[in-house]
Amino acid sequence: MIHLEGITKSFGSLQVLKGIDLEITQGEVVSIVGPSGAGKTTLLQIMGTLDSPDAGMINIDGTNVSRMKEKELSAFRNKHIGFVFQFHQLLPEFTALENVMIPAFIAGVPTKEASMRAMEILDFMGLKERASHKPNELSGGEKQRVAVARALINQPAVILADEPSGSLDSHNKEELHQLFFDLRNRFGQTFVIVTHDEALAKITDRTIHMVDGNII
């Protein structure tokens, strides 16, 4: 599903990633842990084609994306990869349903189909009755679940999450963590999660430890 080979990345004189090799299989829920500055977020961004490595090969869902041009990468990213960040980044002027539909619109999905697909996901997440509410009318946990729904709308093969529960209280953290496994079991996606949350790391299928730009 995800194959990285010899990934390096530097910012100026600082080498952040030092030859990363990594294989993640279809349907795995994988956590990436390590101290601040270990290179976790940079690795996730490169994995998600949001940044490019200085050297190395990236293969996602059977496609070598290493040599793709930006326009190709953008289309590939929108179709094959979903992103969840610590802060939900929902657009305040749109309802929960409309926020979830945005990536589908970008992909050219007809409005009716996008709406049906978005409502199905929101229903699965227990948010059907909140679909017409705007972000300021939702709780923190609800907003983050809407953000997860948005990541799922184009049925991507991979979901990449960077500290997805970092801004939530303990109850909402537990609900969100369980949701990742429920979604994997329902839709078959692969999840790669950068986290400092030890409880989440313990329940993932595999934990990848990073220190100083290396996997140990």
Swiss-Prot record:
Membrane topology per record: Peripheral membrane protein
UniProt main location, coarse: membrane
Binding site for ATP: 34-41
EC number(s) per entry: 7.6.2.-
Keyword vocabulary terms for this entry: ATP-binding, Cell inner membrane, Cell membrane, Membrane, Nucleotide-binding, Translocase, Transport
Domain ABC transporter: 2-216
SUPFAM superfamilies: P-loop containing nucleoside triphosphate hydrolases (SSF52540)
GO cellular component: plasma membrane
Location in the cell: Cell inner membrane
The organism's place on the tree of life at top rank: Bacteria
Any one Gene Ontology molecular-function term assigned to this protein's record: ATP binding
UniProt enzyme class: translocase
InterPro entries, per the entry: AAA+_ATPase (IPR003593), ABC_transporter-like_ATP-bd (IPR003439), ABC_transporter-like_CS (IPR017871), MacB-like_ATP-bd (IPR017911), P-loop_NTPase (IPR027417)
Subunit: The complex is composed of two ATP-binding proteins (LolD) and two transmembrane proteins (LolC and LolE).
Family: Belongs to the ABC transporter superfamily. Lipoprotein translocase (TC 3.A.1.125) family.
Protein name: Lipoprotein-releasing system ATP-binding protein LolD
Protein source organism: Bacteroides fragilis (strain ATCC 25285 / DSM 2151 / CCUG 4856 / JCM 11019 / LMG 10263 / NCTC 9343 / Onslow / VPI 2553 / EN-2)
